[in-house]
Amino acid sequence: MKKNNTNNVWIGAKDLSQDPQFMETAGSEFKDSPLFELLGEEKVGENLKSNRRDFLKFLGFGLGAATIAAGCDIPVKRAIPYVIKPEEIVPGVATYYASSIVRGGDYCAALIKTREGRPIKVEGNPSSKVTNGGTTARAQAEVLNLYNTNRIKAPLRKDENSFKALSWEELDIVVKEKLNTGKAIRIVAGTNMSTTSKKLLDEFVVTYPNAKVVKYDPISSAALLAANEMNFGLKAIPDYRFDLADVIVSFNADFLGSWISPIEYSGKYASKRTINKIEGATMSRHIQVESHMSLTGSNADNRIMVKPSEQGAAIVKLYNEVAKLTGATTIKNMPINDKANNALKLIAKELMASKGKSLVICGNNTVEEQVIINKINDLLGNINNTIDFTHSINSRQGDERGMALLTKEMNQGSVDTVLFLDVNPLYDYVDAAGFITGLEKVPVRISTAYTLDETAAACDFIAPNHHMMESWGDVNPKRGHYSLIQPTIHPLFNTRQAETSLMYWMNKGAEDKETVYFEYLKLNWQNSMFKGALIGEAWEKQWDLILKEGVYEETVSPVSVGFNGDLTAAVNNMVNSKNTDLEISFFENVNVGNGQYAENPWLQEMPNPIDRTVWGNHLTIPISFDGDRRYESFKDLKDGDLVDLEVNGQRMEVPVVRVFGQMQGTLGLALGYGRMQAGKVGTGIGVNANVLLSQNNGLTQYFAEGISVSDKKGVDKDFACVQYHHTIGVTAVDPETNEKFNADERELVDDFWKNVTTGFQGALTERSIIYQTNLKDLPEKAAWLKDKRHHAQELNERQIYNGYDELYEMGHHWGMHIDLNACTG
């Protein structure tokens, strides 16, 4: 293979290999591709024109329903704007309402921007000390979920193989009849962060003594909860203080992307990565131990590559090295690759140098590994410092072992009624096949889904839930921290909040269906949060203040814990690697979660920040180097090639994408795709990796060994990947070889490449937009850069266009500066 680009920074594989086609098109901002080519083989006219709005309409998203339903009224009489309550809606003037975005364990304290009574944008709520004004792409995309015309628009009852609409009164009568005659009732729910909703569920179980609540999460953290209960006596997830940690070691925890509370963690992480002074500058050290390139791994200072099956061995190795340095008892080592073995020895010394100010975390769903992680943090003095149980996190409460018991009960025919509260186990539960078989034996199946997902489609009755922007509620994301959910628009369809449905089925309904849960919520806050201390006008003022701010904090008693656990038993119960040639890890990306957001076109067409692909999941394959910047990919596959993937006897066809940073001998595949009931947008997009998952001691495992991949079978005609950027005007010609190459960023290239022609982006000014250094050389590099800026001042004063002296005299007004240390994705 030809000699590749020796630049230290490249924009992709084609740039690195100096692909001839890439070099020819590098100077063009857009590739000329007629729309009819992009649409495939369908017969469409060459003059076909479309825009983003038409595209969304085709997928079933639009403002038509909102325009009819909402009119131009203030959303709901009892809602309080974030700033000033307007007497009337002013056309063209935005009003903000403090609320919360909650879905599938995700939490965001939000400000909902509305115009003419319609939500149009989600911003972060700066009043929240949990998310601190941050948001995610998922939270932003909830606006589009609201206007999804594929939402269920009325109560439904299955009639043979199709659903027919009925009135809420008719539904309530038949559901209450079924509940009153049922022997065993099971309520399947996800993590519930609402104190008021939990109270209501407790009352539901009292009303129907045969009822039980089963909780599970689409992405499980059950092992972490179980280990903390074993070691600290608390079944809770602690507050991980990334803002206090000088050294962070993460074993497969994508805490900047999708793990537990990424909005909160990103802000805290960035606070320790920001450099505010040149002399004596400090920042945290971050080491990521993983096999596939995660968003968090892409931000790490160092990555230690281990196979998924070696994660436990790596954790044991780190523990033993820390134990040696602290005088603690060591445990039996497990086989691990040599590079990781040597690197972990050095990491242990770094951690010891930051005792009490370090943090070791683990994203694996294995109790034994989490127990050893807890002991490592105990030896390092991190417990009650960087790991704080005083403000424990409530965003993960599920345990799939309860689902296994429910599956067994259903298959035995001992369950009469199952009620699904906004969950979709027929898609995202690890044993969906067994669950489906059992569900078929349940006489009454009820769902509160707001769209027709796989589970709702298998139910007899659907009581469609409001979207959260049409609902009332509260959230307790962390101990001592609360926020409210308030409606910002009238319900667009004939739906009803799930909590209101529960109240009606408990005979707690009032004449006004829209206020029954609001009054229940408000009364619960008055009695539970404020212990009835405020009444009358004083309480109304306090409530309005909380609703306006959107968040509330209470002082909680400090929680101090100590470690108690048996490491010998933990390591003896760990499973050794099978030492197979090929392994795969399954992960949650920042786009669609584990399918909760698959029906959202914004998130489907948002490029994955690592592999830059859209509209589907792709098998990430490694790239190997020969030591001279020549590289080849796994099985010589190229982006978009189709292969057969076989895992645990399951075979599926999947396209591949080459990813730098993927460990040799490993592959990766995102969860959340391959939905069979996800509207026009999500149905049939990608492959369902959930069917490839396995269990260990009842807990979902997100990797597999002994897999096989075929050679290239064909090419995915729908493969979509973001075009290269920052290529305009960067092509130059080597005067010695006449070979075209990328001349930009010449401050970073080897001497061989510095003999470039003038007239291109990097060569014109001898300036780059990317500079890098390390903390040790920062003062010297900063002085050099300052001197370089002084010598380049004449370029800032040079006019490109004549006749605009007055404008040029105003000077440059730079609009954006990106700190790549603090920007996490």
For every predicted segment, state its role:
Residues A328, P491-S560, D641, H725, ...:
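N-terminal leader/propeptide and maturation segments of large enzyme subunits in energy/redox metabolism
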Residues V289-S294, T448-E454:
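Short, polar loop motifs at secondary-structure junctions
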Residues T451-I485:
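Flexible glycine/proline-rich, aromatic-decorated loop/lid segments
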Residues S258-G280, V430-I446, H481-L484:
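A short, gly/pro- and small-residue-rich
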Residues K2-D338, A343-K345, I462, E511, ...:
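N-terminal export/assembly segments and adjacent metallocofactor-ligating motifs
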Residues N527-R612, A763-L764:
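Long, low-complexity segments enriched in small/aliphatic residues
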Residues N302-N411, S528-I535, W539, W543:
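Active-site phosphate/pyrophosphate-binding segments
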Residues N424, G434-F435, E440-D453, H490-E499, ...:
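Phosphate/diphosphate-binding loops
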